[in-house]
Amino acid sequence: MRPEDRIDGKKRPFTGAEYLDSLKDSREIYIYGERVEDVTTHPAFRNSARTMARLYDALHDPKKQAELTCETDTGSGGFTHKFFRVARSAEDLVGQRDAIAAWSRMSYGWMGRTPDYKASLMNTLGANAPFWGDYAENAKTWYRRVQESVCFMNHAIVNPPVDRHKAADQVKDVFITIDRETDAGIYVSGAKVVATSAALTHYNFLGQNMSAEITDDDLAVMFIAPMDAPGVKLFCRGSYEMQAATMGTPFDYPLSSRFDENDAIFVFDDVFIPVSYTHLTLPTNREV
């Protein structure tokens, strides 16, 4: 089941309750050497998850909708957060700015990885789909999907710092690499670091953080991975939120107890990425 399939009724953003329910899937999250069964109740993540849920609820608050939301441009007849629709005028840009600020104020500016932070990437998919060449239709589809539901999209673009003196293809065994390719999609393995807030997201965009010379086609790949895709594992750093709960109360730690955006390492172990989730590959029908 896709996260957005948990939304009850017509195409619209998640409510807070639906967002929390959407996190109760088969994702593999590890912290302190143990697997997290439910990020919405685990003491390392639950308060941060509830903070995110409050943002989604605000989209349905009649007192806040004028500032936060607008009609979709996908033909769904629904509404979305203003930053999830491509701006076509100066007025649209000002509206997006105000909507971003309104959500930011709800965490006193302490959460930078809320669902709207990757809306800029999703907007580029809709505004300049031809840039993605053979994957232009994928770009349009993801722009529509994320806009209509306000899915929580994250990114992980930094390679593990194994040996900075070597070219990427010399340390490819730990980088995200295409293992094999079929007509249905690609299989990838490897790791990415600094996957901030990934434990609380629906999807993650995997790509590169800078222009780099890549001589191995199997390293040239960009795709979107569902958090509950088989073979995807997330290894999280220690939780400030959990430390706050152990050492005191939210009154003692008002910020870290509520607004911890946990950083993590992504590990992909022979993960299947369908063609519809792929945005860039160089190899085609490679025999492995």
Model-derived features: where do they sit?
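Acidic/polar, glycine-rich intrinsically disordered N-terminal extensions of enzymes
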Residues: 1-70
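Structural beta-strand/beta-sheet cores of well-ordered domains, especially the beta-sheet scaffolds
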Residues: 27, 151-153, 184, 202-204, ...
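Internal helix-loop-helix
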Residues: 57-153, 203
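A short core secondary-structure module
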Residues: 191, 195-247
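Flexible, small-/acidic-enriched active-site or ligand-binding loops
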Residues: 230-272
